[in-house]
């Protein structure tokens, strides 16, 4: 819930292109979380890779104005972006731990399909937790009325339904299936390809040119992510 809340607020701050760039923080955070909770090794190359990743993000979001360098994105959005990456990284490791405990409780004579469906069960649990959490937030902020108004917006509900299907259902379920069969860090690294995959459709839909600086920054960031688990 924390990661999604931060991610959607970062989208409001500076759009999905930069929001997904900050999500590349998830693999390093997943590595650190695995080190803390699972006792996985953190070598000096891992810290170097983290520095490269952060350098790539900084290169993308900063712009030179005269003799000074300034951040071209709002601070609030940056903080939400960092929170989104942290939430995704920590959540992925905790999900892996939960799936492992769940797998241990399955009887040996259970059908293999039960194991295959575990990621979808995990997604269902995460969705319920998110529903409860966001409902509490909306009630505390007295914004439930806006939710009911949004339900009558046919275009908005159409996009929301498609987003729910491809995001929480397909995307999250496959991500949990990935961590079920491989290390959380490796799975998170592959999922960090989103900033590259989103460049072309984002530029077409929003009719915005992608600057060389943004492209170079994205490449540097993904290089750092790859270094984190491949060196």
List each language-model region with its residue ranges.
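Juxtamembrane helix-loop boundary signature in multi-pass membrane transporters
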Residues: 28-86, 90, 96, 203, ...
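Alpha-helical transmembrane segments of compact multi-pass small-molecule transporters, enriched
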Residues: 22-36, 51, 129, 133, ...
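Alpha-helical transmembrane segments of multi-pass membrane transport proteins
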Residues: 26, 84-88, 163-168, 194
């Amino acid at each position: 819930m924390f990661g999604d809340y931060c991610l959607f607020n970062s989208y409001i701050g500076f759009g999905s292109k930069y929001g997904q760039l900050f999500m590349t923080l998830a693999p390093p955070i997943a590595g650190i979380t695995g080190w803390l909770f699972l006792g996985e090794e953190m070598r000096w190359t891992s810290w170097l890779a983290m520095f490269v990743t952060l350098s790539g993000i900084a290169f993308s979001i900063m712009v030179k104005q005269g003799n000074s360098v300034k951040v071209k994105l709002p601070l609030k959005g940056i903080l939400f972006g960092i929170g989104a990456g942290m939430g995704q990284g920590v959540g992925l490791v905790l999900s892996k731990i939960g799936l492992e405990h769940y797998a241990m409780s399955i009887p040996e004579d259970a059908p293999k399909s039960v194991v295959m469906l575990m990621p979808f069960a995990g997604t269902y649990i995460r969705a319920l937790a998110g529903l409860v959490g966001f409902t509490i937030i909306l009630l505390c902020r007295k914004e439930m009325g806006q939710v009911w108004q949004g339900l009558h917006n046919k275009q908005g509900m159409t996009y929301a339904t498609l987003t729910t299907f491809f995001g929480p259902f397909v995307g999250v379920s496959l991500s949990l299936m990935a961590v079920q069969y491989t290390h959380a860090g490796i799975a998170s690294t592959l999922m960090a390809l989103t900033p590259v995959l989103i460049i072309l459709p984002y530029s077409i839909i929003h009719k915005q040119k992608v600057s060389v600086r943004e492209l170079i920054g994205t490449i540097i960031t993904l290089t750092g992510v790859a270094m984190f688990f491949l060196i």
